[in-house]
Amino acid sequence: MAKKRIIGIMGLGHVGAHVAYSLAVQGIADELVLVDQNTEKVASEVQDLRDAVAYIPHRVTVRSADFTEVGDCDILVNSVGKIELLRGNHNRVTEMDFTIPAVRGFADKIKASGFD
């Protein structure tokens, strides 16, 4: 039996939600692990994806988690950001003022989860 392909997606805004959907529909992952600080958003995305994968020809498991539960993932996609910071400003570096401290806030949790 082949090893289960598990991909974690951190941040379920515009980018993260689309990445999750694309991975599910294309059959790239056997399991998607969704992480976001907004628990209502995570629950909504998990349910939407579970509904969608019911109609595709391959099996994909979708679950929510927090940063401490990503140790079994093969790949982590970091799509954490704050797109609102770009309104009226098309310089993507502006968003780094949010993203750098955010990554520092969860990096140790990811390490502690056993992700390598």
Where do the PLM segments sit?
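N-terminal Rossmann-fold NAD(P) dinucleotide-binding loop
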Residues: 16-17
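Glycine-rich Rossmann-fold phosphate-binding loop(s) that bind the pyrophosphate
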Residues: 12-13
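Extreme N-terminal starter segment of soluble prokaryotic enzymes
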Residues: 2-7
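Aromatic pocket-lining residues of Rossmann-like dinucleotide-binding sites
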Residues: 23
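Rossmann-like NAD(P)-binding element
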Residues: 59-115
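Hydrophobic Val/Ile/Leu positions in short beta-strands of Rossmann-like dinucleotide-binding domains
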Residues: 8-9, 34
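Conserved glycine-rich Rossmann-like NAD(P)H-binding loop of the short-chain dehydrogenase/reductase
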Residues: 30-38
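Conserved N-terminal Rossmann-fold NAD(P) cofactor-binding segment
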Residues: 37-73
